């Protein structure tokens, strides 16, 4: 019951621990379990037997390092070797060899895998646990219908149903249902055994008539009847071995395989004692399930809550990798059988090496990591993103739900989620509630359940004991939250505390409490735990904040937050972006590239990450924090990574903000900023883009990398070296050549005019035999070349082309259109950058850095930003940093407000600035207009908030089109920035233009600028010669397309011209 117990206080577990434990479970147990299932394989004459000796398998240390695997687009994996034997039964000879089975991708220190040079992570899936579940539904007459649903390990479902006459049916499909006696008899039980093994035999005897008794008279008859109903087959099928195999494959294997978890759940729910190694559904299970269903009908027993976490199981990385390994072993078995058969037919002598190929295992894992929905590319925007991605839990994926079919009840927060799944952190949109994040202290138990820790309160033991309980156990205990009495239960004045028992909230005496919470953060995910004063925010805004922190861009000069929660250091440590000393010693050398550490009689060189690109184009970089000659201890920070300072997470900047309107520039969440943030490089970030090109061997010959490209201006080729590749350190602009490449082509003489051929013959000009296919810098890619990699794949065949990658760094200051956000869901777009002399300024002359709209606070109910803003001002003046746990009101009422006001008062005293805390309007101050010097009419809240710059930047989004490609069918401009597309003037936009009566603009939008082919071709020529653009005479292409589509439906559409004089109809084709 109590999974784990240890004395003393609890520590926060590693944020990547769930991934590590899952992979270790796969290596320790899952690998051996699947290898043990590999059967002995014999040939058709049973003369040769092949088997694996799995007890001594070996996993070899990887041949390459992680960093090399990323740069060379390889997989960081270990080779699996297993001893195998080939036994000749006639001569009793055995041939034993150690064979290479395949490659298994390994998990690195970040909890991720590197497959084909890409960091990938496997997220946890939440599935319905196999077993039986009872529920009740009302039929069309308002009468309760009780059903029992048996869920198999494969996810297949079978239902038992009891009707008004107390007859029990087994539903094999939506439309077909048969008597419970038929499947029981088909599984091997006769009527006497059924009657002897049920609690209500009279009910089972009441409903079979003579015809039904004949159907279950023998096992063969029952199987035939069951097969007819299940497969909806008419006539009189004949019992045969193939019919049994088909029924076994289509029904019993998919719907009756319970697995070890399903067997445990079935035994618990039905009070059975069937051994755990019998994982198949037995007749005894079906009869016990029917008995419980009858009891439900008579008001005995309890119904199941399908959304309770005790009825769910976590499919972790261990289960997914083990499933894939089992699938690969099945494929290997089939391949070995085929190879043995082929060798015998051709009269060859096989060896274990010849029989086994590594392809099944290697390709299975490559396709799993590349194609499986639960294997995702690791989001590496910032260090927090990496941690949170590995702690996701999803209801989606194979065997799970879909975003369009999941009900509101499944998406909703359940009381059993408390302390296991964060009630705040989930995705927005169609997957809301389906993709969540595990709470900080949650862990995955042996049976796939989510466990959470408690402090056990016992009168016998005076020490504090931490225990982990699964959701099926903790609801039977009296559990109290970590309030003031729980933290200090020596106080006798408070005798009554709130508690939870069986998903109900009670108020009971302290003596009756059995368990209590261990940590204020234990209910939240990592992202939500980094929000200070989260208890003062609306949950929807806290959700937005935890999502937006994952979108923060690492800045060039990071800064620790003044107001935090205390988890920043743990988050930075577990992200792996900082360099940590593995043992104590002395620094003997340090530079930007490496740190050399001497200690324990050895010298260790620690390479540092230098301007490495993440998959979101952000810059990952390490900065040394130790100097030469310094003695360090084990675990000390040697170098800070991206978005970390002093080993703490630092995603944003502490800037001086004011909540006030300013000339309408902060209307609708827009943000007004000072030019200090631009020129002081406060919000400057580096972004690294990757451009690559491959060289192939074509039918005309190999492609060439060269700097001699004909017909191109020398200006575009100025940055190429003698090999035709751009030089390191070059500044490149849009359109510049990064890699010069020529592709061979055959020139046809017939394609040239006679005059061309004559001139070439006279002047001796050679025909060009190659076309230019250079790598050019696209729009918006200007920057500095920081790295070039020329990757030669082994083998050098046409199937392994050479790849050249060019990395370009961009320095981006904050500008109008960029998105910024606080840690309380307060987000906005930069609307204007003011000179610092025009910004509002404080009474000591300090200009404000940002101006937010005060109307963004009351309706959004995220008041935590006001507490952070005021406390940040006090911390900035006193040079203090605050780390505040949530729910501090458990100590006393208004604790947050008292803390903020006391710190403001102290800052006012120590700095001799009475305007910092004015009793008439505490937290507010009178500030002045920078343009006029006059004070504003009302006092304004000013303070220091921690503001993040998000990855949604205007440089990646702004787009314009003068000309470009058109869609083939509609002849309208393509959609999207990547295709150089245009904006579509849709139906509602046309209505808006009609409302203003702008007929000529509307005509241009619908013809010249869109899909009138002839008219848009005439525009360019007439514009050049200065002529008048002719009006389009016929209909645009989209209208003609509509006419054609109507014709395909046998509807002819024509229009007619009516004469004004004689009203004669002149027909004209559309």
Swiss-Prot record:
- GO terms, molecular function: DNA binding; DNA-directed RNA polymerase activity; ribonucleoside binding
Q: Which PROSITE patterns match?
A: RNA_POL_BETA
GO CC terms on record? Answer: chloroplast; DNA-directed RNA polymerase complex; mitochondrion
Q: Which Gene3D superfamilies match?
A: 2.40.50.100, 2.40.50.150, 3.90.1100.10, DNA-directed RNA polymerase, beta subunit, external 1 domain, DNA-directed RNA polymerase, subunit 2, domain 6, RNA polymerase alpha subunit dimerisation domain, RNA polymerase Rpb2, domain 2
Membrane-crossing residue ranges in chain numbering = none
* Cell location: Plastid, Chloroplast
User: One biological process GO term for this chain?
Assistant: DNA-templated transcription
The record's section on Pfam families has: RNA_pol_Rpb2_2 (PF04561), RNA_pol_Rpb2_3 (PF04565), RNA_pol_Rpb2_6 (PF00562), RNA_pol_Rpb2_7 (PF04560)
Which InterPro entries does its entry note?
A: DNA-dir_RNA_pol_bsu_ext_1_sf (IPR042107), DNA-dir_RNA_pol_su2 (IPR015712), DNA-dir_RNAP_su2_dom (IPR007120), DNA-dir_RNAP_su2_hyb_sf (IPR037033), RNA_pol_bsu_bac (IPR010243), RNA_pol_bsu_CS (IPR007121), RNA_pol_Rpb2_2 (IPR007642), RNA_pol_Rpb2_2_sf (IPR037034)
Q: Which reaction does it catalyse?
A: RNA(n) + a ribonucleoside 5'-triphosphate = RNA(n+1) + diphosphate
**EC id:** 2.7.7.6
Identify the domain of life.
Eukaryota
Swiss-Prot/TrEMBL keywords: Chloroplast, DNA-directed RNA polymerase, Nucleotidyltransferase, Plastid, Transcription, Transferase
Broad class of the protein's primary localization? plastid
Read off the NCBIfam families from this record: PRK00405.1
Membership in a protein family: Belongs to the RNA polymerase beta chain family.
Protein task: DNA-dependent RNA polymerase catalyzes the transcription of DNA into RNA using the four ribonucleoside triphosphates as substrates.
HAMAP family the UniProt entry points to: RNApol_bact_RpoB
State how it assembles: In plastids the minimal PEP RNA polymerase catalytic core is composed of four subunits: alpha, beta, beta', and beta''. When a (nuclear-encoded) sigma factor is associated with the core the holoenzyme is formed, which can initiate transcription.
* Protein name from the UniProt record: DNA-directed RNA polymerase subunit beta
State the organism of origin.
Nandina domestica (Heavenly bamboo)
Gene name, per UniProt, is: rpoB
